[in-house]
Amino acid sequence: MSLANLRTHYTADVRPDKVENGQKVTLAGWVHEVRDLGGICFVVLRDREGKAQVTLVKKKIDKDLFDAARRLVRESVISVTGSVKFEEKAPNGYELLPDEINVLNVSGSPLPMDTTGKVEAELDTRLDSRFIDLRRAETTAVFKIRHESLRAIREYFVKYNFIETATPKVVATATEGGTALFPITYFDREAFLNQSPQLFKQILMSGGFDRVFEIGPIFRAEEHDTRRHLNEATSIDVEVSFADHFDVMELLENLVAYVYTRVIENCKSSLEVLGVDLKVPKTPFLKLTYDEVIEIINSRCEEKMHWGDDLGTLGEHTVGDHVYETTGESHYFIIDWPTEIKPFYAMPYEDRPEFSKSFDMMHRTMELSSGAQRIHIPSLLKNRIESQGLNPDGFEFYLKAFEFGMPPHAGWGMGCERFVMTMLGTENIRDTVLFPRDRRRLSP
């Protein structure tokens, strides 16, 4: 058989509106299950889109074909040509009566893990054998939804006249200061894997690009070992000229609603596989000031939060529960953070410089995004760099862009994995990335 003839349809494409009863089709995929009942044999073929039942009745079919089907090894790769018989009780509403079964590759045995869902596997086992785990319907569904989310994000930004960019991931200096960087050797110099495209996004504002977005990897050398942290992640970043923090908050909340809408419209079967009943968040999202957040936490928790503290995990859950109980919504903003606990490029308020024009977009369970109006005045920016104990000389390439006409601008960054995780209610962020990198895992 020619490779071009190994498949005519995906399993989900065999439907009464596309295929006639009795029509010949060829499906290709993996042997999900074989059920030999003596006089009848069922082979469940699985591909990316679902499953199809191949039915062989001993008295009605060639003996060699029947015996070959009975001997099929689970997870072997096969191509099956046969006639479609629509049957409500069969998987996907039809069965395939085969004329030919081609075994393209025989699977080894025993399998590293079960793909049918009958035997649960721990996350580490699944990640160690990711090539098998990716064949599970639940795993595939997560990545179909992630794909649709990123497609919708690009669609949204193109609709609003954004330019997609790609900035360096190998840099000479820290983006936001601190030590959470992975050092690498760059010929005869020390360099780092970039922790954020922040500085480059701002340079693009000086370059007149006006509205940019980027979807790309970021690297954080933080020794977290939690269900919601990764050391390599995908960041969705935005920067907008002639805008303040309220403008980009509106952009962000509308993006979230847009993506949820697209996922609901285009990922019905994947959501069904995961048992997720997705609802579009209502906009505008509630905005709480940093001071209001302190009041909420201190009224509900024994462990008090003080002005100048960052928000810990307990605080995030406490405020998230409060918002959900009072509004029925999971997304909200925290605004007006203390200047000193935000990055040096966050713009302070002119009349109360101890507060910054910054925000975090929160989910009921965790932070999803952080953003701000940026400082565009060179002297103020340099002072803020120095006030955080950083050397302006290390940011020369960045500061130059502010000396020759930098417009007011604002932006944000959002982690793709956390966004998908909270959308689907996934327990561990590692389930939302194909090959996760954390402090313990560097392979596969």
Curated annotation (Swiss-Prot):
Its EC number is 6.1.1.23. One of its GO terms (biological process) is aspartyl-tRNA aminoacylation. It catalyses: tRNA(Asx) + L-aspartate + ATP = L-aspartyl-tRNA(Asx) + AMP + diphosphate. The record marks 91 as: Important for tRNA non-discrimination. Its main location: cytoplasm. GO terms for molecular function: aspartate-tRNA ligase activity; aspartate-tRNA(Asn) ligase activity; ATP binding; magnesium ion binding; RNA binding. It comes from the Archaea. It is an enzyme of class 6 (ligase). Mg(2+) 3 binds at residue 367. ATP binds at residues 220-222, 228-230, 367, 415-418. Its cofactor is Mg(2+). L-aspartate binds at residues 176, 220, 370, 374. Mg(2+) 2 binds at residues 367, 370. Binds 3 Mg(2+) cations per subunit. The strongest magnesium site (Mg1) is bound to the beta- and gamma-phosphates of ATP and four water molecules complete its coordination sphere. Residues 198-201 are annotated as: Aspartate. Homodimer. Belongs to the class-II aminoacyl-tRNA synthetase family. Type 2 subfamily. Aspartyl-tRNA synthetase with relaxed tRNA specificity since it is able to aspartylate not only its cognate tRNA(Asp) but also tRNA(Asn). Reaction proceeds in two steps: L-aspartate is first activated by ATP to form Asp-AMP and then transferred to the acceptor end of tRNA(Asp/Asn). This is Aspartate--tRNA(Asp/Asn) ligase. It comes from Methanosarcina mazei (strain ATCC BAA-159 / DSM 3647 / Goe1 / Go1 / JCM 11833 / OCM 88) (Methanosarcina frisia). The lineage of its organism: Archaea, Methanobacteriati, Methanobacteriota, Stenosarchaea group, Methanomicrobia.
